[in-house]
Amino acid sequence: MQVLVRDNNVDQALRALKKKMQREGIFREMKMRGYYEKPSEKRAREKAEAVRRTRKLARKRAQREGLISNGRGSPLK
């Protein structure tokens, strides 16, 4: 991964690098590989993530269709 440093502005380059790494999922990958994960734990985690994704998608779909509010007290328009 490469980030350009312009006008010796290292702070800006560091922020850009962190943003790129976050977008690519590198921080999450490093956290996952920090220790050994048993195959059974991996399956359970992946299943829980899939359930979470499915619920989130269903919630978004219901909000779009106007079945539930957007969580801010007023229904979506």
From Swiss-Prot:
Region of interest (Disordered), ranges: 38-77
UniProt-listed InterPro entries: Ribosomal_bS21, Ribosomal_bS21_CS, Ribosomal_bS21_sf
Gene3D superfamilies, A to Z: Ribosomal protein S8
Keyword Ribonucleoprotein: yes
Disulfide pattern: none
Source species, domain of life: Bacteria
A GO MF term: structural constituent of ribosome
Xref: PROSITE patterns: RIBOSOMAL_S21
Keyword check for Ribosomal protein: yes
Ranges annotated as biased composition (Basic and acidic residues): 38-52
A Pfam family per the record: Ribosomal_S21
UniProt entry keywords in alphabetical sequence: Ribonucleoprotein, Ribosomal protein
GO cellular component, one term: ribonucleoprotein complex
Biased composition (Basic residues): 53-62
Protein family membership: Belongs to the bacterial ribosomal protein bS21 family.
Listed NCBIfam families: S21p
Protein's UniProt name: Small ribosomal subunit protein bS21
